[in-house]
Amino acid sequence: MRIIFSIFLLFSFNFGISQNLKVVIDTSITTKHKTVIKGIELEYTAETGMQPVWNKEGTAIASLFYTYYRRDHVKNSNKRPILISFNGGPGSASVWMHMAYTGPRILKVDDEGYPVQPYGFRSNPNSILDVADIVFVNPVNTAYSRMIPNKDEELPD
């Protein structure tokens, strides 16, 4: 019984800490990659970051976590379409859109959808990155997207 209680306390403590983690808003990380789509190798840039959401007074009230896949070496990038994709949230992050069907890389799975060994990722031959850039957005309180408390530690309305 002591072991069960100790495990319960450990998980409760870790859950409480993870809910209070602060992620710096208005930051991004950029990396370069290659993938194969419809038999053609292409280079792309992946950018993840936190986008602030402001109220009418100009105060940041939330931060949205996003991942932006941008195809490199495009002649007229100003006219390139952008697909914005998001799950309903909260509780359902955009990870399955990234890693299951739309993103440039997908999980290694068999025909029935079960993971295969060695675990990992492979190029997504059906990604739309060849024709449009993709932005995945996690709604507030999903994944890393969060409301930002005010100076009194109260959440905005």
Regions from the PLM with identified roles:
Residues 3, 40-41, 139:
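Conformational gate/switch positions in structured elements
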Residues 14, 38, 50, 141-143:
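Generic hydrophobic/packing signal
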